[in-house]
């Protein structure tokens, strides 16, 4: 080698960058996702088991057997069952307002028949199977076949959730402040504050939301997302529709109580118990609130009336949950058949 030639480059001891196997990374993320879903399902089952355990202990303590519940069912007059069925039909018409508000806020045009189909199917499946397993899944199926994008459906479901909480807060606020409520001691102790304070807090949240809808007319940017609040007229419709929904649903439950118990158990207590059950059901994602609603109701009412209360819940689940599930399933199957025969329906912006 020539002495004047430049020295050969020295080898380095630095390690080479690791080779990332994208397939393994993807498999790992999927495994984590499956683990998370399994944990979620396990938690839901555990909550249901705890709820049923609470109900069972209450019933054993009150000496309530299935024969007592059957007797309570037989004591409900047919005319009260007829009223409950009529209120259920009216309630499901009111539920259409949830989807109508969401469609209007997204500035989309969709035939009223499809809006009604989406609402009836979505809420029927949500009531029986839960929102994660039923309601949101069938809504995605329906609205995607009608031309809604994934992000539009996400926004759609967010509007439905907002409307739900607005009506719940409004009714709970009014009930806590203005209505004669008889809360059991074990429930009152867990409220931390007096129920009148909770009523003011709930109504305060409603006032802040309406004020925000009036003031912020331009989209609010949150990181990479833009949130557009509905106009005041549409936000008041959210309150009317959701409050009407909860009032009618709790009226269905109230009318299924035997006549002898209706005088002892006032509607305002039934309303608060039903709203409490709805809150816990939504937060825990228990399908249909099975066990949760029963657990709340047996905690709100005296032991001597538990047989009649459980009888009312059994009838309520049949009339309000399972009967609408039949036409909802027929509508879903009909929509699936139509979707396979023709391309996706176009949805127009207003």
Regions of interest found by a model, annotated:
Residues 12-24, 128-143:
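Cytoplasmic juxtamembrane interface segments
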Residues 2-120, 178-282, 304-306, 310-311, ...:
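Predominantly cytoplasmic-facing regulatory/coupling regions of multi-pass membrane proteins
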Residues 40, 142, 154-157, 161-162, ...:
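Hydrophobic alpha-helical membrane segments of integral membrane proteins
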Residues 151, 167, 323-327:
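Discrete transmembrane alpha-helix packing/kink hotspots characteristic
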Residues 113-117, 131-136, 145-162, 305-316:
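Membrane-interface alpha-helices at helix entry/exit sites of multi-pass transporters
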């Amino acid at each position: 080698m020539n002495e004047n030639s430049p020295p050969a480059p020295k080898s380095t001891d630095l390690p080479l960058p690791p080779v990332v196997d994208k397939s393994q990374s993807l498999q790992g993320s999927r495994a984590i996702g499956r683990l998370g879903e399994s944990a979620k399902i396990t938690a839901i089952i555990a909550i249901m088991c705890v709820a049923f355990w609470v109900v069972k202990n209450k019933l054993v303590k009150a000496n309530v057997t299935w024969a007592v519940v059957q007797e309570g069912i037989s004591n409900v007059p047919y005319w009260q069952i007829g009223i409950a069925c009529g209120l259920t039909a009216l309630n499901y018409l009111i539920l259409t307002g949830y989807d109508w508000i969401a469609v209007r806020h997204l500035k989309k045009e969709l035939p009223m028949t499809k809006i009604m189909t989406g609402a009836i199917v979505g809420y029927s499946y949500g009531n029986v199977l839960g929102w994660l397993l039923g309601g949101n899944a069938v809504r995605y199926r329906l609205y995607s076949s009608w031309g809604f994008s994934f992000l539009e459906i996400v926004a759609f479901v967010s509007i439905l959730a907002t409307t739900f909480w607005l009506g719940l807060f409004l009714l709970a606020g009014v009930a806590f402040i203005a209505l004669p409520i008889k809360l059991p001691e074990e429930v009152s102790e867990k409220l931390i504050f007096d129920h009148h304070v909770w009523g003011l807090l709930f109504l305060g949240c409603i006032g802040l939301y309406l004020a925000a809808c009036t003031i912020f007319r331009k989209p609010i940017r949150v990181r990479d997302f833009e949130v557009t609040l509905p106009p005041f007229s549409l936000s008041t419709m959210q309150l009317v529709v959701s409050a009407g929904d909860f009032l009618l649903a709790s009226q269905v439950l109230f009318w299924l109580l035997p006549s002898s118990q209706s005088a002892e158990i006032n509607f305002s207590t039934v309303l608060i118990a039903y709203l409490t059950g709805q809150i816990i059901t939504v937060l825990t994602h228990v399908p249909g609130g099975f066990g949760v609603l029963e657990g709340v109701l047996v905690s709100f009412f005296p032991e001597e009336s538990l047989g009649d209360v459980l009888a009312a819940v059994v009838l309520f689940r049949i009339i309000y949950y399972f009967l609408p599930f039949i036409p909802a399933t027929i509508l879903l199957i009909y929509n699936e058949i139509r979707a396979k025969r023709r391309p996706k329906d176009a949805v127009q912006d207003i």
